[in-house]
Amino acid sequence: TMQRDLKQLDEQILELMKERVAKTNSEHVSEIEQLTKQLDLIASTVSYKTTFTPSPLVGYQGVSGAFSEQACQNFFSKDVKTIGYPEFEDVYIALKNGDIDYGVLPIENSSTGAINDNYDLIRKYGFYIVGETAVNVDQCLMGIKGLAQSSDFFFAHRFMNPMPYKDTAMAAQYVSEAKDPTKAAIASRLACELYGLEMLQEAIQNDKTNKTRFMVVSREFISPVDSDKVSVIFTLPHVVGSLSTMLEITALYGVNLEKIESRPIKEENWQYYFYIDFLGNMRDGSVSKAIEEMKAKASTFRLLGNYKKA
């Protein structure tokens, strides 16, 4: 297959590079050792791909018109084939079973912060982050679930009776099916179009710059050659300063740390794992060295992905 051929080609390139390094003068031994370590780090994930599956089937949480479906279209294309699932974990299960090629799931909102369930689920299922995209969360009047993000609007329109609904797109679907002129919903423009609703007012959310960042999840490690963001997950030994030591590694190698999250390990009381995002490409020497040193200092360590920043 093409994947097997690419894997064999990667292996051959790595071997040729090692042979060339081995012929270098002995005075450069330390440099050779460092380069070999970098090559070995990349070789350990030699089965990685640089391109995505053509014409993929992509899963997301929600129904048609959800912001998650919009994220699928943003990352892949307007014509991408998608399938919605009731819960976040249903997407992971579908990916595990091979029912879909990729999953697109929210990881962070600029107003409300991290979506912790998806940090926990990607760790639980052992998948990889292969890309990300950001969606402008413009809540438009036609229905409900943007209540927390649109409270200012309702304060100014107190004659309305806001009622929570499970999902913005589901709210739009409900209003469309109810055909009751006294009902409205708050949802995306996409939902408005899909369910044939009339746009009453656009962008009613409090924060006009509100965005949600979505991650693209895969069973396989895919790293485009122009990747510029790395995600890792790890646990640490119970030693004073162990976390600061990990963070010092990023400073030592000039790696720009973007995000750090700590999450409790559900199966182990008072134990935590850490999720870190930093900028870089694993093919670069300083980045591969930083990854290697982090791995050496951690109790457990996993490279979640190296992909293009949104």
Identify the function of each model-found stretch.
Residues T1-A310:
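Domain-level signature for soluble enzymes in the chorismate/prephenate branch of the shikimate pathway
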